[in-house]
Swiss-Prot record:
Residues 269-279 have a biased composition (Basic residues). This is B3 domain-containing protein Os05g0481400. Residues 45-68, 233-279 are annotated as: Disordered. InterPro entries: B3_DNA-bd, DNA-bd_pseudobarrel_sf, REM16-like. One of its GO terms (cellular component) is nucleus.
């Protein structure tokens, strides 16, 4: 019991000493004016918090019957019609006194040349190539549908391009047999003609199976000779020419037989004149 009473007395003495120390500290703070400063700071903080502007509420947009558009410009009607006037005027230009005009587009006829017609056109193109100046590089190209319709892209022989054309993009002039000039764009890294080839193909009605001879007349100029695979005028005239040749051969053989026979009668008319010409 005595021990407990002693511990209680010690605790009470400690609390009394602590209370005195707190009072002395408060008095010391009052002497320094720190207590008043802390109160003024608390009041200023409360005043600033109360006067802070409250955030404005967001406006609620009402969705109407009209379509919502992000762009502020006026809506224009959509047109799916392509305009090639400026492109065609760039593609085709005529030299000298020739008429300057733009060629309108044509629908693909769908006509496909047979294998024999393609081979005949290719061989004629090779013969024409052999008659050109050997100093000018040249090659023969047979047209397929992608060259003359749809994409209008003409790939050139890779070996020819590496030997005679620079590996960059630049303008080239396509000149036909009549001297007509068409501006085109050669793409070196793809070894082909793109811009301008469309106008040349449409102007000359190129079709699948046609053979073209490309002669590099100048570093930036191709002279192009066209051999049509399906030529209606030529096809109509061929049978007549063959018949005339056959009649001529028959008449010549008859004249020779009559001349060789011992009892041959004197020739009259046309056969006599033909035989006299041969002698």
């Amino acid at each position: 019991m005595a021990a407990e009473a002693g511990s209680a007395a010690a605790g009470a003495a400690y609390e009394e000493e602590r209370r005195k120390r707190v009072l002395e500290n408060l008095k010391h703070l009052e002497d320094l004016g720190i207590k008043k400063m802390s109160k003024s700071l608390l009041e200023a903080a409360r005043l600033q918090k109360s006067t802070r502007a409250s955030p404005k509420p967001r406006k609620k947009f009402e969705v109407g019957a009209t379509e919502v558009r992000r762009s502020s410009r006026a809506r224009n009607s959509v047109s799916y019609k392509e305009n090639f006037d400026e492109l065609n005027s760039f593609l085709c230009r005529r030299r000298g006194s020739r008429i300057r005009s733009t060629e309108q587009g044509r629908d693909y006829t769908g006509r496909v040349a047979s294998y024999e017609q393609q081979q005949r056109a290719f061989k004629k193109a090779e013969r024409l190539q052999n008659s050109l100046d050997p100093e000018n590089p040249s090659f023969v190209k047979t047209m397929v549908r992608s060259h003359v319709s749809s994409c209008f892209w003409l790939g050139l022989p890779t070996r020819f391009c590496k030997l005679h054309l620079p590996p960059k993009e630049y303008k080239m002039v396509l000149e036909d047999e009549e001297g007509g000039e068409f501006d085109s764009v050669y793409i070196g890294n793809r070894t082909g003609l793109s811009g301008g080839w469309r106008g040349f193909a449409m102007h000359h009605n190129l079709e699948d199976g046609d053979s073209l001879v490309f002669e590099l007349a100048e570093p930036d100029r191709f002279k192009i000779y066209i051999i049509k695979a399906v030529d209606e005028d030529a096809n109509e005239s061929e049978p007549a020419d063959e018949e005339a040749i056959g009649d001529k051969d028959t008449s010549t053989e008859d004249a020779a037989e009559q001349d060789d026979s011992p009892n041959a009668e004197p020739l009259k008319g046309t056969k006599r004149r033909k035989l006299r010409g041969r002698r």
